[in-house]
Amino acid sequence: MKRTYQPHKTPKKRTHGFRGRMKTKNGRKVINARRAKGRKRLAA
């Protein structure tokens, strides 16, 4: 049986990367929430 997680850098960066987050209003919300919480890493 094939495993479910088959990692690829490009799709990961596109969906969870910083610029990917900045593209949408909700993504920007995520970044701001992580900034407010004081996260060291804001995006993947």
UniProtKB/Swiss-Prot annotation:
Domain of life of the native organism: Bacteria
UniProt key word Ribosomal protein: yes
Matches recorded under InterPro entries: Ribosomal_bL34, Ribosomal_bL34_CS
A GO cellular-component term linked to this record: ribonucleoprotein complex
MF term (GO), any: structural constituent of ribosome
Keyword Ribosomal protein: yes
Transmembrane segments: none
Family: Belongs to the bacterial ribosomal protein bL34 family.
Record-given protein name: Large ribosomal subunit protein bL34
Organism: Campylobacter fetus subsp. fetus (strain 82-40)
Taxonomic placement: Bacteria, Pseudomonadati, Campylobacterota, Epsilonproteobacteria, Campylobacterales
Gene (name only): rpmH
